[in-house]
Amino acid sequence: PVGGDLGRPLSQTTKAAGKGSACALCPAFGRCGGCSRLDVSYADQLLAKEQQVAALFEGIAPAGALLPILGMDDPFHYRNKVISPYAPAKGAKRKGKDAKLARADILTGMYETGTHRLIPTDTCAIENETAKKVTLAIRDIMARWSMEPYNEDTGAGFVRHAVVRVGHKSGEVLVTVVTNGEEFPASKAFCRELVRRVPEVTTIVQNVNTRQTNVILGDKERVLFGPGFILDTLCGLTFRISSQSFYQVNATQTCLLYTSPSPR
């Protein structure tokens, strides 16, 4: 996948991505902690990874034992699981109990590398586009209905995260809304509105996490809409995927890994 951390040897690196880095593929690159190699062509990333593995096995493996690396035809928007935190924008304050939130009052995106400073992003080069659409729709619904984002510093606020999983083959979409409390006002209306905005959504689950922690999911859950899981097919096998399930985030390369013939 493009943009990953594995592979470019330091000898081939001009400098690590910094706060001032720019990249045509992503306006947040260099600040967002999601990618660190998005400014390097995919072909060069693959070459660097191949060279790194070759260096590790030099003097150990016989000559010609290293097979060419198998990359993706399209290394973008491959992540079928997207985790988006929500946080109040700096300085955002509601004037009175009944005052409305604005979209700009709610941040969602990725954390800056090594911090818990949220970098807002409306686009992402590696996340599934339907999943990204869901996370932004939730932000807009929160603003419209004055649903407070969670504040890590104070422990106040209601919506902490959205975890979205999209079936690679099935296209089914599971949305897990992580809340800071069990009571979910107008949950049925929320589900109707989210499905109206993103019709691909097939099920919505509320996960409750009231602990002041960086751990995303809590122990309590309830299904708000649909069956509470999605089905997807991987390498000819059907999997039932819930909010807590492990499932490879790059289904394309997973199938390639398991179906490629092994040398004897």
Task: Locate predicted features.
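Conserved small/polar residues in nucleotide/adenosyl-binding loops
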Residues: Y258-R264
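SAM-dependent transferase fold signal centered on methyltransferase-like domains
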Residues: P1-R222
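Intrinsically disordered, low-complexity regions enriched in small/polar residues
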Residues: N80, P88, T113, E152, ...
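Class I SAM-dependent transferase core
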Residues: L118, K220-L257
